[in-house]
A protein has these predicted regions:
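Cysteine endopeptidase catalytic domains of the caspase/legumain-like
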Residues: 1-463
Length: 463
């Protein structure tokens, strides 16, 4: 069965890190090239003294002390050339002279016997590196399965401690102690911590302004660019119906669109969704849960129709969709319904603005891990990009009681950065206010009588 914990874990860690004034980019199910480009964008947020944190949940392995994150398009069997080396990301972070580098890796650390290459990664000697591994070397990571959406084992305990005003290694030590008391994973999974931290560095260190304020402002604009939501809008049809469209971000590459009827003519007797050849599985549903929106549902307005659009990082051109109505009036008698349509262009929302689908740049993390047969030395055929989220069926809830299962995880990652005070450099301020929500003011309870297909055809329109 599809496991659900990574999506829940990424969502909750995103909210916790934002409370700590981190700029957070949260992404799910990326291909290899998308992962490498996402790392490039993450690095743009870093500069001298900034605290950088990377959380990853998904398939992974460890060879010769190096950890590898496996993208969704990796072949079977996969090798290091198909994956992203965590230590190569660390090397690039060190080049930014960051104040703290934290890696939280919620993945298996078994040896990959299909991969015999030895990475040649030369790291600087810096006393600011912390690794929190969800499991021990050469061991597997687990998650609990149940009839509801719950956290993985690591984040189940991490989220209770992450906001503590303590040195990050102290926080992880306490998480390890908590995990050690958990009967379900005793003897199967234990948190491992590796650290070179020589000073008291905490994720709660205050964010202050300093000489690097201008640079921080530039980086904040870069982050804001990837989290800009479309403006809510009102659509008026010739028939007298008025519709409100609103937008929310579930993740940096997942957009939620919700709509409701604001006004309709009193003599309208029938109005329903236009039946077109579009898969309605995640479109125009009366509850967020029907579309797979389990985590954001409590934050959305009620009495709407909801659509969930994922895989935004694959969007190459502006996103155009058609809002379609069909209905009848009292005066029409037995005549067939009339159709009305309007085209809506929301350009490139959220992470789509950063074009993660682009070819990998030559100065990306490919260059930090010189391995035989790596893409930068022996280019192979490009992976075909499949729809993001790979449509894992999160609606299939397990009926069994809690049990342990090997982490066959859909990929999820959180990258965050913040500039706390505490390192003698010139710290600068980074605001981490979450992306703007466009919430319509009006609402209607009359959803059964008047329905709208606000995305019945997705089109790509040249910029």
């Amino acid at each position: 069965p599809q496991l659900k914990a990574p999506m829940v874990d990424v969502y909750e860690l995103t909210n916790l890190l934002r409370q700590l004034n981190f700029k957070v980019v949260s992404l799910l199910d990326l291909t290899e090239s998308e992962m490498r480009n996402a790392v490039d964008e993450f690095l743009l947020l870093l500069h001298k003294g900034v605290y950088g944190l990377l959380y990853y949940a998904g398939h992974g392995y460890e060879n010769y002390g190096n950890s590898f994150m496996v993208p969704v398009d990796a072949p079977n069997p996969y090798h290091s050339a198909n994956c992203l080396c965590v230590q190569s990301v660390l090397k690039l972070m060190q080049e930014k002279e960051t104040g703290l580098n934290v890696f939280l890796l919620d993945m298996c650390r078994k040896r990959n016997f299909h991969d015999d290459s030895t990475p040649n990664i030369v790291l600087r000697v810096t006393a600011n590196i912390v690794f929190g591994y969800a499991t021990c070397q050469d061991a597997e990571a687990f998650e609990l399965s149940s009839t509801s959406f719950i956290n993985g084992v690591f984040v189940k305990f991490l989220k209770k401690r992450l906001l503590d005003d303590e040195k990050i290694t102290v926080v992880l030590d306490r998480v390890a102690e908590d995990m050690g008391q958990f009967d379900a994973t005793k003897g199967k999974q234990a948190l491992e911590i590796r650290s070179s931290l020589s000073e008291r560095r905490a994720l709660t260190d205050p964010v202050v302004s300093g000489d690097g304020h201008d640079l921080a402002h530039v980086h904040s604009r870069q982050w804001a660019k990837a989290h800009e939501l479309p403006e809510s809008m009102s659509l008026s049809f010739d028939c007298g119906v008025q519709i409100k469209l609103g937008f929310a971000a579930e993740f940096s590459n997942v957009l939620v669109i919700y709509t409701h009827i604001v006004k309709k003519p009193a003599d309208m007797t029938f109005c329903q969704a236009h039946d077109l050849d579009v898969d309605p599985k995640e479109m125009n549903r009366e509850t967020p849960e029907e579309t797979g929106i389990y985590l954001l549902s409590s934050s959305l307005p009620q009495h709407c129709l909801y659509t969930r659009l994922s895989s935004l990082q694959k969007l190459r051109e502006e996103l155009v969709f058609t809002v379609c109505l069909q209905g009848t009036f009292e005066s029409m008698g037995e005549e067939p319904p009339i159709h009305w349509t309007k085209s809506v262009n929301i350009r490139k929302p959220l992470i789509a603005r950063l074009d993660l689908h682009r070819p990998v740049r030559r100065n990306s993390c490919l260059q930090t891990c010189l391995m035989p047969h790596s893409p930068c030395h022996s280019p192979g055929p490009e992976h075909h990009a499949h729809l993001y989220h790979q449509a894992p069926d999160y609606s299939r809830l397990l009926s069994q009681p809690h049990f342990l299962d090997v982490a066959e995880l859909p990929l999820g990652a959180v990258g965050g950065c913040g500039m706390p005070f505490g390192d003698g450099t010139s710290p600068c301020g980074l605001s981490s206010s979450p992306g703007r929500f466009s919430i319509p003011i009006e609402a209607s309870d009359d959803i059964n009588e008047v329905q709208t297909v606000f995305i019945n055809s997705l089109q790509l329109q040249p910029q």
